[in-house]
Amino acid sequence: MERIERDPETIYMLYTGGTTGMPKGVMYKQGEFLTFLFRTLKAMGYDVPEDLSDLEASILASKTNDEFIKSLVGCPLMHGTGMWLGAFLPLLLGGTVITTSNLGFDPDKLWAQVQDKKATNIVIVGDAFAKPMLDSLDRAKNSNNPYDIGSVKVIISSGVMWSAEVKQGLLSHHNMSLMDTMGSTEGGIGSSVTTRENPSETAKFAINPGVIILADDGEILKPGSDKIGLIGTSGLVPTGYYKDEKKSAETFKEINGTRYSFPGDYAKLESDGTITLLGRGSNCINSAGEKIYPEEVEEAIKTHNDVFDCLVVGMPDEKFGQRIVAVVSTVDNKVLDELVLIENTRKKIAGYKLPKQILFTDEVKRAPNGKANYKWAKSYAEEFQS
C-alpha cells in the first residue's frame, strides 16, 4: 500500500472525558502532536527510530533484546490515557496493543489476559483501576492460585490519583516500574516513577520542562513558595477547543510571549522543584472562606484499610457556605464507624478539611474511564440532607 503523506497542519482532535462539564473537542496540529509523542517515548527510555526506514530494524532489535512492547489497555480507548499511552505510544514503536473484549472493568479478566498474552505494559486510570487489581492479586495469592505476571515491566496510569499505599501493594506481588503521569487531554504536566527501591509520595510529581505554577494574582511561583496556583504547560499546547472560543481563551493563554495550557488543576511548588497536586479548581469547596480540594480529602480518607473508594463534595451550609461531605464505600461492605474514620483522616490533613458528614454506599459510582462522578456523589448526598 502506498504511503499517504499527511499535512502536519492537519487537525487531530480528541474529546475530553467531560469530568467537570460537557465533553470538549481538543484540537492539536498533527505534526506537533506526533513530535510530542516521540519526545514522550524518548523520555520514557525507549529507542525511537530516526525515520521510517529504521522502523523494521528497530522492531527486530526490540524482539531480540526482549524489549518488544505488548501493551494491555485496561481503560477505555475514548480516554486520552487509553488512546495515547495505551495505544499510540506502543504502535509508534511497532508494538502490540491488547484490548479487552468485555464491557466494564474486570480485574480478574485483566490479570488473566496479562498471564495469557504475556503483556509487558498495562495502562490504567489511578486507584479506580489499581485498587481492584490489587484486591484481585491478593485473592488469587491467598487461594494458592496466583497469576503469573512476570512479563509485566511497567504499569502506566494517568487521570486519577494513584495512592502510594496501592502502589506498594502491587509491588509486593511483582517488581516492576509504576509510572504515574499527570496531565489531561489539554497537555502533559509531570510524572512519578515508583519501584521497590524507590517509593514515592501520593500526588507528588516531577514536572516536565515548560511547566509553571501561576498564582491567582498572576505571579509565576518559585520553588518553596507558600502559595498555591494553577498548573500551566507550554510543552504541547492545543490550538483550541472545537467551536468554543470562550473556553479556549480561558484555558490557552500567552504569558511573557509563551503560550500555555491551563487545564484547571491547582498545585503547590515544593522547594525541591516537584509539585504536590491539589486538584481541579472547578471542584474546589469553599468552606468558611477556606479553599478545600476534594482529591486531597479523598486520598486522606482512603488511607484507612477498610475504605475501598471515596468521593468528596461540598454541600450548602448556612454557617460555612459549604460543608464537606464524603461518600464512601468499604472493603467487602464492612461496617465502619463514621467518627473512627474521621479521626483516622485527621492524622493526614488539617482539621478544617475534615468531612462534616460521611455517607456510606455499596458502590461509589465512577465514569467508565475511572474519573470521579461528582454529579452522582452530590445527588446521593442530597438524599440525606434534612
Predicted regions and their residues:
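Conserved pre-ATP/AMP-binding loop-to-beta segment of ANL
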Residues: 1-15, 21-22, 52, 60-71
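Conserved S/T- and glycine-rich ATP-binding loop of Class I adenylate-forming
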Residues: 10, 16-19, 71, 77, ...
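Conserved AMP-binding A3 loop
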Residues: 11-51
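Gly/Ser/Thr-rich phosphate-binding loop
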Residues: 18, 92-95, 119-124, 134-200, ...
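Conserved AMP-binding/adenylation subdomain of ANL enzymes
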Residues: 34-74, 78-123, 136, 140-143
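AMP-binding/adenylate-forming catalytic core of the ANL superfamily
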Residues: 115, 234, 239-240, 250, ...
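Conserved beta-loop-beta connector loops within the AMP-binding
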Residues: 212-233, 271-272, 334-338, 372-373
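AMP-binding/adenylate-forming catalytic domain of the ANL superfamily
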Residues: 347-371
